[in-house]
């Protein structure tokens, strides 16, 4: 608790896009992130849609990802999960309107090599998966 308070005093939370205080990514900057413009591939012989949540070249998103993966800031899983949720919500709406449903869904984070996890201190895809699981109330498999 004390460590968190001290870190907030030394490194206050501010939006990566506009520097607004008390947030890593404000709603205005979340909405202004560049959307992916390329063709979205399909996986598993067209049985599985892929979702690309943003343009990696977007400077705000790029900085968030780099600081999350290599800067050790685990709190960035929250704004990054919002980026994913924004795209997933579109897909869920389209699928429900067309009669497609998600069926039985389980979230499986991408495994991270043990050396990389030890170096980083956490598996970033696991943190994102937990955020999505909490938001959608979908089961998660961490095995």
Give the residues covered by each predicted segment.
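Glycine-rich phosphate/pyrophosphate-handling loop used in enzymes and phosphotransfer proteins
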Residues: 1-143
């Amino acid at each position: 608790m004390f460590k968190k308070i001290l870190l907030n005093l030394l490194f206050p939370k501010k939006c990566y896009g506009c520097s607004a205080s008390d947030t890593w990514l404000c709603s205005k900057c979340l909405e202004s992130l560049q959307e992916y413009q390329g063709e979205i591939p399909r996986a598993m012989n067209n049985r599985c849609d892929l979702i690309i949540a943003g343009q990696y070249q977007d400077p705000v998103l790029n900085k968030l990802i780099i600081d999350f993966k290599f800067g050790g800031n685990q709190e960035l899983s929250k704004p990054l999960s919002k980026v994913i949720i924004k795209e997933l919500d579109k897909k869920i709406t389209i699928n429900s309107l067309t009669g497609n449903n998600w069926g039985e869904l389980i979230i499986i984070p991408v495994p991270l090599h043990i050396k990389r996890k030890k170096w980083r201190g956490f598996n970033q895809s696991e943190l994102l998966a937990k955020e999505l699981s909490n938001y959608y109330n979908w089961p998660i498999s961490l095995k």
